[in-house]
Amino acid sequence: MNQIQPIITATLAAGSTASPFLLTLNVTQQLCETTCADAPIIFTPSVSVDEWAQVDTGLYVVTCHVDGICSYTPCQGGPCCTRTQLVAGAFTVPVYAAKAPTAVTITTGQTINTVSADPCHRCSRLLVSETPVILTVQ
């Protein structure tokens, strides 16, 4: 199991002030081994709503869970050396609503994955994944 937890942030899109809310989900994860920045990396996160709770008058917090398997080829490895790594964590989204939500759903768009590497280095251990998300509060 991966001991290094991912950094997960959800950023509200400009102008998204009412449900459905448009978000960009960013998952940054340190990989167990270095991989080439130009090599394909596969990570398709599964995102689900865990719960929502009232934290103040008209203010609710939606807790979501992200998980998936990252598949990559380490540097110095060939196509037979593919590694997999579990990526899992949670994030929260604050929601203002006049009445308590009765249902909260989440859908995802197409994920874009990159390996973040300095210009002078061709290998890195840092996965950066971005996924568009629609959060619907009813």
Model-based region annotation:
Residues 1-138:
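Viral structural modules
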